[in-house]
């Protein structure tokens, strides 16, 4: 059992809370029963499992440890002070994992008929990003494109907010010019953008079956270079004194409109 806070392995794991170390290693730290369980279920590449026996008291937790050991995962037992130095949860559950990040290169992606993707341009809040990942999973959106200078989806706050969806939605990083070139060869993926100034109400829009919902940053919205790529621009009408919605909320509203529209189409087809 590791009891030293200065143990070299523990120090290296602790550094994964920092962006530069996650980028350098291609790894991230996931904490908690649910997230570790979903990592195992999804076939994520788990490099190390960190266990605190005094905190990991549930039968499900022990089942996760047994599964990891059968897969040959390196399992490290640590005491409570050491685990607390790694944890970000208010009430640590005694289990965490060091996991390899998963990315797909934009140029390798080919849209399949009926797929729903989401693109986020310069999103800065990791909690918003994690929440959007969770919503993508819920509505069946298969890919999330992070455009330009987005926050890290493997930030601990994003991983926590995703509730395990970090393992089920494919992630891609790119920038405006590369995205424009890619879309020139994949125009079957219809881009729907959002703007407060758009004429079309999101609830009155017929969304294409193969669709990418493109959302701008929390403060600036979509730049003109992205608006020019959009086939449709929609807005969410608002009353009251506020002039904008939280990005994760706005994304969720439109995604569920798309989802419900698709559900109604499938139900209607099934009744014919």
Regions found by a protein language model. Give the residues of each.
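N-terminal positively charged helical leader segments and presequences
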Residues: 1-88, 188, 267, 271-272
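Glycine- and other small-residue-rich loops at beta-strand/loop junctions that grip anionic moieties
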Residues: 2, 28, 121-122, 147-148, ...
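Glycine/charged-rich beta-loop-alpha catalytic/anionic-binding loops adjacent to active sites
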Residues: 19, 110-118, 229-238
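Amphipathic alpha-helical repeat scaffolds
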Residues: 32, 124-132, 245-250
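RNA substrate-binding interface of SAM-dependent RNA methyltransferases
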Residues: 41, 67-70, 79-81, 103-198
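Structured adenosyl-cofactor binding patch, chiefly the S-adenosyl-L-methionine
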Residues: 97, 135-139, 153-166, 224-272
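Active-site/ligand-binding-proximal alpha/beta "capping" segment
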Residues: 192-240
């Amino acid at each position: 059992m590791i009891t030293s806070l200065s143990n070299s392995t523990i120090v290296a794991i602790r550094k994964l809370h920092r962006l530069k170390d996650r980028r350098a290693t291609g790894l991230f730290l996931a904490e908690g029963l649910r997230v570790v369980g979903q990592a195992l279920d999804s076939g994520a590449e788990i490099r190390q499992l960190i266990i605190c026996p005094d905190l990991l008291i549930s039968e499900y937790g022990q089942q996760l440890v047994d599964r990891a050991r059968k897969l040959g995962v390196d399992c490290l037992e640590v005491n409570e002070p050491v685990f607390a130095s790694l944890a970000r949860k208010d009430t640590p559950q005694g289990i965490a994992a060091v996991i390899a990040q998963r990315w797909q290169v934009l140029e390798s992606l080919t849209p399949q008929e009926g797929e729903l993707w989401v693109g986020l341009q310069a999103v800065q809040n990791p909690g918003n990003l994690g929440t959007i990942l969770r919503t993508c999973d819920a509505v069946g959106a298969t890919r999330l494109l992070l455009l330009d200078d987005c926050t890290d989806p493997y930030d601990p706050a994003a991983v926590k907010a995703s509730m395990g969806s970090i393992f089920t939605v494919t992630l891609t990083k790119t920038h405006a010019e590369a995205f424009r070139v890619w879309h020139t060869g994949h125009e079957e993926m219809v881009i729907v953008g959002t703007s407060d100034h758009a004429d079309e109400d999101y609830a009155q829009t017929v969304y294409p079956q193969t669709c990418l919902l493109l959302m701008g940053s929390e403060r600036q919205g979509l730049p003109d270079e992205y608006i020019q790529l959009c086939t449709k621009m929609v807005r969410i009408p608002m009353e009251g004194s506020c002039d904008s919605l939280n990005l994760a909320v706005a994304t969720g509203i439109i995604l569920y409109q798309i989802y419900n529209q698709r559900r109604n189409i499938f139900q209607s087809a099934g009744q014919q």
